[in-house]
């Protein structure tokens, strides 16, 4: 261990062990998954915190050998055992890219699209993107790079093949092979009533396909083929959101499908249900009418939805009348 710390020091990294770990130092061969909490601090006397994974409620997961954008994290993680807590003071040469990495991690923590920022955009938008990271502290750090302290608490180290790999860590070939399996897992979870977990699986499968689609020319046969795989997954995701009563997300996604495929019966039906739930009666009726036009066999189901909508509207009208009577009776 002394030799390891000496080599780190030669490379501009000073390690200080706060709590010893347990067992032997893992081999950390390529594909090993390290799960840890991290805290990033300024190296000045105040040592103010820049980022803290505990505050976000989810630890960091790093796959060794996947060329993470902040190589120093892979370097320091390789020196740690499970249960160990340590601080690493890293020279500027190791921390220059931290602001960009931190922005991505913050986006993920806020539940934003993991592909956000990777899509094509106009030159002006790209110029703005490069000039600002959207966080004042990260902008300041990018303009004035400095040594940083990484406080790492190693929770778990898993060897290759002993864990389910996250989509973002997969190669293109691995993504393509994983999508059907993730889709099946989502279906199983939905059947068992685990709707939130099913939605997460569908989301992962969509993210895999979107990532592959970004590498194709829009409108090309390969791009269209991937889009046709995305659509049923997105409809399943919308079904989960209907159950979770997140209706506006359903409206958004179903509309995006119908902008491309205006004969998709399931998208009209789910959007109609979402419109009905948020009292957009005319829009709901129009979508249900389109369902009947495209598939008359669904008449019994559509009739049931329309009756339910009419009953809710009558009930709401009666409640509104009672409320107004109460107001004017005072």
UniProtKB/Swiss-Prot annotation:
Keyword ATP-binding tagged: no
GO CC entries: aryl hydrocarbon receptor complex; cytosol; membrane; plasma membrane
Disulfide bonds: none
InterPro entries: AIP/AIPL1/TTC9, PPIase_AIP, PPIase_dom_sf, PPIase_FKBP_dom, TPR-like_helical_dom_sf, TPR_rpt
BP term (GO), one: protein kinase A signaling
PPIase FKBP-type domain sequence ranges: 31-121
Localization in the cell: Cytoplasm
Top-level taxonomic group: Eukaryota
One Gene Ontology molecular-function label: GAF domain binding
TPR repeat segments: 179-212, 231-264, 265-298
Parts forming coiled coils: none
Residues with PTM Phosphoserine: 43
Keywords associated with the record: Cytoplasm, Phosphoprotein, Repeat, TPR repeat
Record keyword Membrane present: no
Subunit details: Interacts with RET in the pituitary gland; this interaction prevents the formation of the AIP-survivin complex.
Chain's role: May play a positive role in AHR-mediated (aromatic hydrocarbon receptor) signaling, possibly by influencing its receptivity for ligand and/or its nuclear targeting.
Protein name: AH receptor-interacting protein
Native source organism of the sequence: Rattus norvegicus (Rat)
Lineage per the UniProt record: Eukaryota, Metazoa, Chordata, Craniata, Vertebrata
Gene designation: Aip
